[in-house]
Amino acid sequence: MTYTGIGSRATPNKWLKAMERVATILSSAGYVLRSGGADGADSAFEAGSTSSTKTIFIPWEGFNGKSSQQEGIFSGVCDKAMSMAESIHPAWERCSRGARSLHARNIYQVLGKELASPSDFLLCYTEGGKKIGGTATAIRLAEANGVKVYNFGNPDDVKEFHTLLKEITLSII
């Protein structure tokens, strides 16, 4: 069981705390986090997960002080991930090389290391629940692959995820 845990680097503190708690519960239930090693939401999900229940995809070696020498961290993006990101990004031609690598990294967060195993669901935060920033790439990919998206910036998604989290919590008691 896997989930993608991502979102804005500017995620409000109340949601960062909630993300860490949610990650702890999901980790206890056996879910493996897929995230991207960025500050903000990514780091909150990562902090709540144990090392054996997280897989972190970084766009290049040393991103945010992380290394593929660390357990559960994978570095770099392949041509296929880059092509997939290009196909869903609305303004690819305006992205720098670094931005393109960051968007391609998002492909792994949703589809896994082999780009063939969609997460069970995606948790994120964007202001107002909008498809914005790098998170939008992951949201679009998730939706295209039938992955349910729960955006904590959308009150309806919060309510729906709360129901799912109750079910997951009951399964580990």
Give the positions of each predicted feature.
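Acidic/glycine-enriched connector segments
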Residues: 1-4, 9-162
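Glycine-rich ThDP/TPP pyrophosphate-binding loop and its adjacent helix/strand module
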Residues: 158-173
